[in-house]
C-alpha cells in the first residue's frame, strides 16, 4: 500500500469517527430539540457560521498549519457541539453551533485539498489520469465516511429504543404534507426521551469524537509541513490579504459561478432528509427511536454507492451519474408529495432514504471531484467556495423550515434541482469544448529545493495560491 493510499484511509476513518457523533446528532436535532424550532435553528447557525468561515479561514489555516493540523483543530470544534447538547438551551446550543461552523469549512477544505493533491501525485507516479485517481480517492473517502451514519444512528436507536411510545392514531393525520401546521408544533410521537438516555448517547458521541482527533493526530502524515513552515516564516501581511481574498477572487471564474446552484442544491437535499423527512415522516409516524434505524438505510446506501460511483465515473463519465441522481431525487420528491405515512407501511420509510443515499452519493463524490479537477491550481480557495455555497443551501433550507408548508419546501427543492441541471450541463459542455489542462508533476512540486531528509517520494507539497 502506498503512503498516499494509507493517508486517504486515515483521513477517511478519522471522519468516520467524527461524523458518527455529529451525523447522528444532526439527524435528531429537529425532533430532539423541537421546542420553538431550537434544533433546526441551531443547524442554521452552524451553516451560517460555515459561510462566514469559508470567506477567509480555510486558505489561511491550511497555508499556516498545513492540512493535517487544520483537520485536527477543526475536529475539536465539532466535539464542542456535542458538549453543548448536554445542557440544551439557546445560549449553549447557539454558541457551540457557531464554534462548530467556524471549524466546518477549514475541516472540509483541508480534507478535499489533501485528497486532491494525493490523487494528482499518485496519478503522476503511475502514469494515470489525475482526475481518475481523484474520483477513486473521493469514492473511497465517501464509502468509509458515509458509513458513519450507520453507526451514529444505530447508537441513537439502540439507546432511545429503551424508551418507546406508541403513536396515537389521531396524530397520524398530521404526518407528511397533507396538512400545513405551524412547524413549531410537536406532532406525532416526538416526545423527548428521558434525560438519562440523552446524556448516555451524548457521552458516547463525545468519546467517539475525541477518539477521531487522537487517531488523525497520531497516524496522518503531515504532507505539507515544510511548505506551511516556509509560508509562516517568509510571508507577510501582503500574503495574508492575498490568502484572505483568494476565496472571493475565484468567483471571477464563470465556471465557479455556474456551479453555485449545484453546490447549493447539495445543501438543500441533505437538509431536507435530515430536517424534514426525519421529523414530518419518521418521528411523526414511527417515533423518534426509529429515526436512527431509518437513517442507517440512507447511510448504508450512500456509503456503498459512493464507492461504486467513484470507480464507475471513469467508465460512464460524470454526466450520466449526475442525471441519475437528478432523476432519483425528482422521483423521491414527487413520491413524498403524495405519500401518506402510516406505521403499517414500514418498508416505505426505508425506501426513500435508500434512494436518497444513491443520489447523495453522486452529489457528494462527483461534485467534490469536479471542483478538484476544474480548479486544480486553486484547490484551497475552490473547496472553501464549495463549503460556502453548500452551507448557504443548508442555511436557507433550515431557516425557512419552521415557517412554510412542507409541500412548499418540496417545490422549492425541485426548482433548485432544475436550475442545477441546466447550469451543470453548461459547465460540462464548456469543459468538453475547452478542457482543463491536467496537473503536472512540476506544478505539484514546491518552489524551494527538495530537502535531504525527504526519504519518501510519495510525500507531496501543497500547491501555491
Curated annotation (Swiss-Prot):
Membrane topology: Multi-pass membrane protein
CDD domains: MFS_unc93A_like
InterPro entries hit by this protein: Ion_channel_UNC-93, MFS_trans_sf, UNC-93_regulatory
A GO term from the CC aspect: membrane
Keyword field: Glycoprotein, Membrane, Transmembrane, Transmembrane helix
UniProt key word Manganese: no
Subcellular location as annotated: Membrane
Top-rank taxon: Eukaryota
Keyword Glycoprotein set for record: yes
Transmembrane spans: 8-28, 40-60, 71-91, 96-118, 140-160, 200-220, 256-276, 281-301, 319-339, 343-363, 410-427
Known glycosylation sites: 183, 189, 237
Family: Belongs to the unc-93 family.
Name of the protein described by the UniProt record: Protein unc-93 homolog A
Annotated source species: Danio rerio (Zebrafish)
Amino acid at each position: 500500500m502506498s503512503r498516499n493510499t494509507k493517508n486517504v484511509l486515515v483521513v477517511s476513518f478519522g471522519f468516520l469517527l467524527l461524523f458518527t457523533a455529529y451525523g447522528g446528532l444532526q439527524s435528531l436535532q429537529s425532533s430532539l430539540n423541537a421546542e420553538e424550532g431550537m434544533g433546526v435553528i441551531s443547524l442554521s447557525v452552524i451553516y451560517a457560521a460555515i459561510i462566514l468561515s469559508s470567506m477567509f479561514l480555510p486558505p489561511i489555516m491550511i497555508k499556516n498549519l498545513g492540512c493535517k493540523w487544520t483537520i485536527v483543530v477543526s475536529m475539536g470544534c465539532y466535539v464542542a457541539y456535542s458538549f453543548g447538547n448536554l445542557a440544551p438551551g439557546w445560549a449553549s446550543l447557539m454558541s457551540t453551533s457557531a464554534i462548530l461552523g467556524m471549524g466546518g469549512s477549514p475541516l472540509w477544505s483541508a480534507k478535499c485539498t489533501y485528497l486532491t493533491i494525493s490523487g494528482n501525485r499518485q496519478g503522476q507516479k503511475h502514469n494515470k489520469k489525475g482526475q481518475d485517481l481523484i474520483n477513486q480517492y473521493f469514492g473511497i473517502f465517501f464509502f468509509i465516511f458515509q458509513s458513519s451514519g450507520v453507526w451514529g444512528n444505530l447508537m441513537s436507536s439502540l439507546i432511545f429504543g429503551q424508551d418507546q411510545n406508541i403513536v396515537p392514531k389521531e396524530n397520524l393525520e398530521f404526518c407528511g404534507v397533507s396538512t400545513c401546521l405551524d412547524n413549531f408544533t410537536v406532532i406525532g410521537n416526538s416526545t423527548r426521551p428521558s434525560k438519562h438516555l440523552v446524556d448516555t448517547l451524548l457521552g458516547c458521541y463525545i468519546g467517539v469524537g475525541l477518539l477521531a482527533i487522537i487517531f488523525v493526530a497520531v497516524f496522518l502524515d503531515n504532507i505539507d509541513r515544510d511548505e506551511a513552515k516556509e509560508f509562516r516564516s517568509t510571508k507577510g501581511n501582503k500574503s495574508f490579504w492575498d490568502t484572505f481574498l483568494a476565496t472571493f477572487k475565484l468567483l471571477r471564474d464563470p465556471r465557479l459561478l455556474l456551479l453555485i446552484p449545484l453546490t447549493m442544491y447539495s445543501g438543500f437535499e441533505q437538509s431536507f432528509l435530515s430536517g424534514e423527512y426525519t421529523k414530518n415522516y419518521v418521528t411523526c409516524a414511527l417515533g423518534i427511536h426509529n429515526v436512527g434505524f431509518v437513517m442507517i438505510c440512507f447511510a448504508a446506501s450512500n456509503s456503498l454507492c459512493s464507492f461504486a460511483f467513484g470507480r464507475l465515473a471513469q467508465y460512464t463519465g460524470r454526466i450520466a451519474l449526475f442525471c441519475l441522481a437528478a432523476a432519483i431525487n425528482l422521483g423521491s420528491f414527487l413520491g413524498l408529495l403524495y405519500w401518506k405515512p402510516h406505521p403499517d407501511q414500514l418498508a416505505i420509510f426505508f425506501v426513500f432514504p435508500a434512494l436518497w443515499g444513491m443520489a447523495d452519493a453522486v452529489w457528494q463524490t462527483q461534485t467534490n471531484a469536479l471542483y478538484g479537477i476544474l480548479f486544480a491550481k486553486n484547490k484551497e480557495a475552490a473547496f472553501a467556495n464549495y463549503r460556502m455555497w453548500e452551507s448557504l443551501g443548508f442555511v436557507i433550507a433550515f431557516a425557512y423550515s419552521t415557517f412554510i408548508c412542507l409541500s412548499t419546501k418540496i417545490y422549492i427543492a425541485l426548482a433548485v434541482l432544475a436550475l442545477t441541471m441546466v447550469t451543470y450541463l453548461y459547465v460540462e459542455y464548456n469543459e468538453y469544448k475547452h478542457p482543463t489542462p491536467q496537473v503536472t508533476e512540476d506544478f505539484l512540486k514546491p518552489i524551494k529545493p527538495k530537502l535531504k531528509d525527504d526519504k519518501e517520494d510519495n510525500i507531496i507539497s501543497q500547491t501555491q495560491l
